[in-house]
């Protein structure tokens, strides 16, 4: 039985040149749990017991544990082959002795070596990207620059907002004495969360009272 998610992990294993360990029929991919640093022994055993039931019901032969899933798979009691992909072995069962295929983290793929732990049965695959599988060549994380039209619209909105604030300040401060302006000034200064209008009003009154 090919449990949902297993095919994706099998494809990753193929990219790591481990075709001989694949078993598309009877493979289970173990994914997600809770936060890596929060998963407790009880939670790990609870997830593992649930997966053991699925294994028995579906006659599964191979379990692929990705990241946190490898730590959960380390608690399985079923007689299955376990393969870790970037396994979070630092939180795995101390008796875990299955193969853990780990990407080479020297190329900035984002896998934390601390989470991998000092695990003996590890094969490091150079150029593997189990935590960033589908990043195309030439991909950039920077947002694309806005079009000239969008920049012009943003500039116009900013100009209109400034003009509206200036008019509101003129109406509020017209024919006010210095004492009245000072009262307005300190009222605005006492506000904890000053909006754009308050800041502009404070600056305007400061200039008037100099």
Curated annotation (Swiss-Prot):
Superkingdom of source: Viruses
Protein's name in the database: Viral protein 1
Native source species: Chaetoceros protobacilladnavirus 2 (Chaetoceros sp. DNA virus 7)
